Amino acid sequence: MCTIFAKKTTSGILVGRNLDWLQKGGTLHYMPSQRLYGSPTKALFMIEQMGVDKPYEGVNETGLFIGCAVTPIDLNPPPPDDNRDKALKMDELGAIRFVLERATTTQEAVKIMDTISLNNSYLDYFLRIHFLIADSDGNIAFYQSGDQTIFKSLENGPGEVITNFPKSANIGNCRRYNTVSEHFDEVKGMETALKLLEQVKQDDYTIWSAVFNLNSLEVWLCIETDYKITHKFSIQDELKKGYSSLDFGTLKLSDPEIKQQFAAHSYELASSEWVPCLGL
């Protein structure tokens, strides 16, 4: 229930992402480079719901992006386990952070992914995860464990998109896929990319919409289909402050427009108690 697209524009390589899911909430993490196993990791930004070790998406300091969506297993059953000889075994979501900490390009990311035996943690829900990987040079990969990786370049064609079908499947009946494909030419920058995400939102299920510029390392974020309020961040500026995390509840309350709404509301005294008339 997700949509991820990538498009080359004059302002940079843009990735747009709707996280459509059953569970609300989320947390942003800014992770500076650290020494790990004797080597420095790449600094990165991630968004997650299940813990800092299991992000749904992220981008590192070099402009490498990895995001995931699910596919039904009846459309693309997992292959027989041929990864038993791989030394690294990892959760699919955990692999996103692991790879972002180490890779610079799409090709490097795929090479690292190929060394990992990925645990299909969503099989109990009849789902598999597939990934869109993109770098700041416009190199794209569609990756799903056990399947052949598809490489593309944003230099050729209007853009690339994944939803909830394998890239090799006939997806003519997916409204979100078709809508994005038909409106790629409208994506000129961050604002128009966000408008395209708004077109393919799913009212009860879109938890966040994010646009990443893989060259300037900017991110724009809207929460729970509230496209009137856009949270804008410079990943580089935030990383300079050191490690930080910010949950969606705190993020929404910190927005100046939200603060102004509280300041504009009146309060009435009733039954010897202060009762806020917020209309929320």
Go through the PLM ranges and name each one.
Residues 117-125:
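Short arginine-rich
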Residues 100-102, 108-118:
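Short N-terminal edge-element motif at the start of the domain
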Residues 1-101, 126-280:
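C-terminal, well-structured catalytic/ligand-binding subdomain of enzymes
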